[in-house]
Amino acid sequence: MANFGCEDLRSQDGESFLYFAYGSNLLTERIHLRNPSAVFYSVARLQDFKLDFGNPQGKTSETWHGGIATIFESPGDEVWGVVWKMNKSNLSSLDKQEGVKSGMYVPIEVTVSTQEGKEITCRSYQMTNYESVPPSPQYKKVICMGAKENGLPLEYQKKLNSIEPNDYKGKVSEEIEDIIKKGEAKTH
């Protein structure tokens, strides 16, 4: 893993960076809760990685009540996501959201390919110590909404939709419940 200071991560203005999202931050409204500078840059594919869900350090997410997304190296697999262009001023809030200080995730550099075939280096996050468990229905829904909103490939959307969630039937945080309700209203 290379150092975050790599030139490829920065846009030409030097004030922003590129972030590859593959979990709940696929959804525009979700990423904007803590990172208002995020602007859609591209749909992209991360080759030789696989999506998984887990409890970081074996602890259930108090926000999502189930496994949360991570990626791990897996030759021949791929993870689709969204590249967001973000102002460097949001880097600390993104790290905080991803639980970097508590050791939930570590920032990594990944090289992704856009649908046009352009390769770009982005910041992303990966859990290093987790127990695989299914996501809550609400978390799965937010990821699927983001995949649909941003036009991830239909086959990948089907794969996301086929993920078996856990049986959590309670509520998640109010701000997330609001996002889910707004998303459901758009599709009806």
From Swiss-Prot:
The keyword Lyase applies. Pfam families: AIG2_2 (PF13772). One of its GO terms (biological process) is release of cytochrome c from mitochondria. It catalyses: an alpha-(gamma-L-glutamyl)-L-amino acid = 5-oxo-L-proline + an L-alpha-amino acid. Its EC number is 4.3.2.9. The modification Phosphoserine is found at S173. The keyword Lyase applies. Keywords: Lyase, Phosphoprotein. It is an enzyme of class 4 (lyase). The active site is at E98 (proton acceptor). One of its GO terms (molecular function) is gamma-glutamylcyclotransferase activity. Substrate binds at Y19, F20, A21, Y22. GO terms for cellular component: cytosol. Catalyzes the formation of 5-oxoproline from gamma-glutamyl dipeptides and may play a significant role in glutathione homeostasis. Induces release of cytochrome c from mitochondria with resultant induction of apoptosis. Belongs to the gamma-glutamylcyclotransferase family. This is Gamma-glutamylcyclotransferase. It comes from Bos taurus.
